[in-house]
Amino acid sequence: MTSWIRLTAPAALAITIAGPAHAVQYLSLAQAQKLAFPSATHFTEVQAGRVWKADAGGRVLGFFVFDRVIGKHLYIDYSVALEPGGRIHRVDILQYRESYGDDVKSPSWLAQFVGKTVASPLKVGNDIRNISGATLSSLHVTEGVKRIAAFAASLR
């Protein structure tokens, strides 16, 4: 019995020290959709669990896209709201799982994406500021938003 404890104690200690991931959900999908398109009366799913068309009284307001990228080690869930022509209307962080680097949820950092299109550089160090201490998170969110801006052309 003592040898069993001696063998498993280091593993148990390592798990305890590592601790659980730091996951914080800031917004649900429904909350993010409503923030992106407050006047929308209906969200129609265009692509299962990923893309919705927002409309009000039959008028298309834009598209809401949910995506997920890796931060440094763990996923970041975010959304991009697009105008009908593909211009970025809003970006939100829905869930951040890393223990640090959550500055990517800062409204001032996310506001940099507003008005950008597929023709914009959308590159950290160019038209998007890097975040010290969240370099990989800011890089990967920016790459994800750029991918969605390119995808927006297929939504018209």
Model-derived features with residue positions:
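Bacterial N-terminal signal peptides that target proteins for export
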Residues: 1-9
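Flexible, solvent-exposed loop/hinge segments and secondary-structure transition points
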Residues: 19-139, 143-156
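Bacterial N-terminal signal peptides
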Residues: 8-18
